[in-house]
Amino acid sequence: MRLFHDASYRFIQARRKAYVVSGIVLTAGVIFMITNVLNTGSWQNYGVDFTGGSLIQIQVYENLSAADLRDALSGSDEITRFGEESEFVVRAPVAEDGSIGAVADEIETQLAAAFGEEAFDVVRTEQVGAKVGGELQLKALYAILFSFLLTLIYLAIRFELRFGMAAVIATLHDIMITLGFLAAFRVEIALPTVAAILTILGYSLNDTIVVFDRIRENMHKKGARKRDPVDLVNQSINETLPRTILTSGTTLAVLVALLVLGGAVIRDFTVVLILGVIIGTYSSIFVASPALIEIQNRWGLGRAGEKKKRPQPATV
């Protein structure tokens, strides 16, 4: 991309402004999470996969609203519009010792009694036990934490410990902002959403490694130890900028097409991925690289994880 071929942007010098922006967004996300806990008892909008219960997607053939369906079900179930105006999703929790099949059958029976069997069709049904839902929550958390651990170990071996720490900071930044977004807009957390979060983690890490690899390459060039580390990191970011813009741009183009044409079933999954690509691109430039500078300035952690006695200027 010739537009950024000879770029010389001073990204690291703008890191404090980026810290402010990230801090504001992260704080807003935490506030939304706390608000959700106070209002609903849960910091996220967990789907049936994680809470247990029954989910029934129905298509109605009469001019029925969510309020009409709620009245037919005695107002005890959560009903939301899904995709087209004639499609709704009914969610009903189930007790630990309850029958999830009985709950789904009861919902269909009540709707048929109120509107007639020809007034609607059941498009799909999902049923998850409460115990299984709790186990899935725990396993999803383990998956994310385990990915952080593997990231740190891999980068500590492949690069140095400080690179691994900086990458984990950037990835944690991306995940927290994504969770804040999900909390703010009450996006349902289901298994596809967790898959999207793990995909974000991988995409963000890939962007970060590309920049870190160029930093390491420039560190080994002749005369690098006499250079200001900030200038060296800026040069590395600028050299990888065309690749970053092209990769993120083409990925976003595909995801936008998927969002427009993919339908409501994968809408939340696609939205989370779009957000993740944008945040991952931002963090690889304004979070990971500045974090590497800050870690080096404060602790100078090298491959063995020990503070160097006399760090050289270009040992970023």
Predicted regions and their residues:
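A structural signal for conserved, well-ordered secondary-structure elements
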Residues: M1-V316
